[in-house]
């Protein structure tokens, strides 16, 4: 339906451009670019993953349960592309300590992660989810969620004491995560980032510049911002929602200073991005509840030049047109009811088809068909049943998790609606995303616009989608479960081409599977497996000319994305005053008058107190026990997985000390 709509718009604007007599060169590039966008989405559609969890924080020893939804963005529906979902548990330092695969059926999957002995210390752990196909794009494309994992309570059931370890370099723990945003200019007390609207400052043209002010930990700051040239203040502004704000600035080629002063009196100076002598400036007004207004101006040397623009949502063309630049620029209005809800993107291109400016804006959704209502009751009491009335679209499924609001841990309140409509199209962590979808009024529209300007990462790269930049597809789309990789020579006399492989898999229940394959001219192979669950052991054999021949068999399974930087707001704990765990006494009346046999009812047993602990008869055996050692450790290295990765790459196996020194510089 969306493709048909795009084609109709395409033909419509063809005749509009022709009748208006606008630049035929710009129109020709518009025609080519819209066609390239359609082709890109047809052959390389993107996916989004959302995980719905049962809680907002966990204790060591518990289990993280989740329901996964995989969405195809070009059709805004559950995906029919990928069949395998990867879910990872990542330590605060960025080590992936657990990776599981789950079968995606009709765009959905479900599963769990056990917080067992692999979780050595409490801390803020990250759960990531992605399909292999998604790793062809930036690591910002994948799903990511940070959870506090607390120490196991000393008294079972007492969750009021939540103890969590702080990540400290005094403990000589390495950090494999990305550093903070490279665009951020870090100083002692104040960090400031500046974003010209549309992407560039142009001399002689007034631009809107968004800014984001925070402290060295990433916490938002209230501050005043001054633009100073020489000894004169030419403009000033101040922060608004969450340390963000706007200023209007007209560069003239002379250097200016930016002075930022916070509420405590601390101040620092910064520089704005360099201005261009020639170019375009885009200004977008989103405050009208009915429409979005775009105004494009250019430097005088570009008067008479043709430009074209494309409005897209999820990479799909919604509107397109051309214009000829003049002294007054060009203005276009886009009606909100003709645009899709969520994050939309305006891309401006010159008469040669190059992207010269772009801008994100948010369109508030008004269609809310999913509702959950709690039946009215005189009072809510512990262990009392509550009736829920739920409404959703027909022929759909949904998941539901219920928890005590007073036991919320890190204040995380995002749902699938905020993820799909907002945060999955933006860069980094979005604090309180539900705020932007709360009301469609001037205050919320302005806050959402500030968010678009400072965290507007481009999930859909229009330079790439229009053919201006090459897309490299490194990983395949897994429409089934595959084993693929490459053979590496052990002896040079044995070529890796046309080698027969046979694989045998077996599990603890005694089931077996077998498969065969042949390598290509470069030694690559792939074998398709039927769906299977739990752990399986695989044995692989290689034959050359029907004789067993030794090769190093590499498996392509190391495509885990780069670990991102964890935002300050993701590691904040909501205080809890008291425990909210209740037990029904044995003689308390049931809420239901329906007779339930004794063996079908739940029974509250008396608390059992442990008076003694087992003492090892052989102390050395206890000391050498791996599980006992892991319990007292601060770092965990899965040497077996590391050895597999080295073998898969065809590299020589290093000595343990050399490997540790490379893995962790503190071992040097």
List each model region and its residues.
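Bacterial Sec-dependent N-terminal signal peptides
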Residues: 1-32, 390
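Surface-exposed, low-complexity/disordered segments
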Residues: 40-44, 55, 59, 80, ...
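Ligand-binding face of N-terminal immunoglobulin V-set domains in extracellular IgSF glycoproteins
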Residues: 111-115
